[in-house]
Amino acid sequence: SSYVVKPGENDVSTKDVYGGTTRFFSQVMTKRGIEVNFCDLYDEEKLSNLINDKTKLVWFESPSNPGINIFDIEKYAEIVHKSNAYLVADGTFTSPFITRHLEHGVDIVFHSTTKYIGGHSDTLGGVVTTNKEDVWEKLYEYQKTSGGIMSPFDAYLCQRGLYTLGPRLVMHSANAHKLAEYLE
């Protein structure tokens, strides 16, 4: 995100995000001169008030980790897109198999391939997806200059995980549904 956001600009992030994300925003981004505002995304008015001309991205997870909070993605896309900011989601918790963020108005989606996509806890990596041409060009330029490319073996391990992603998540969902019914 520091390639999309420049010093003097700002990010808005929900408070309820993965600890590594919180550390990245509060320790890395702020040292680069980027202001980071954490807020409760359930408060639409507060979110709207935090977004200004310097806001370049609004970051969230839905469901969030660790709180498992669900956000109305389309509503937040509507709020964010009234500005020049991008709506960015970490989709790791549900994978693209369950939550298709881009179809609900999200501009950029991150996934840790270490989790569901890899599926076997034996790879390290991540992917970034977008359907915005201008974002794609910035990300591709950054990838080419920084060398942010997965090793061939890690790519193979992720491909292997993708073969079983659907069946694994169908079973996860069925088990979660049974548990929810039991707890009602």
Give the location of each predicted region.
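Conserved PLP-enzyme active-site core in the AAT-like
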Residues: 1-184
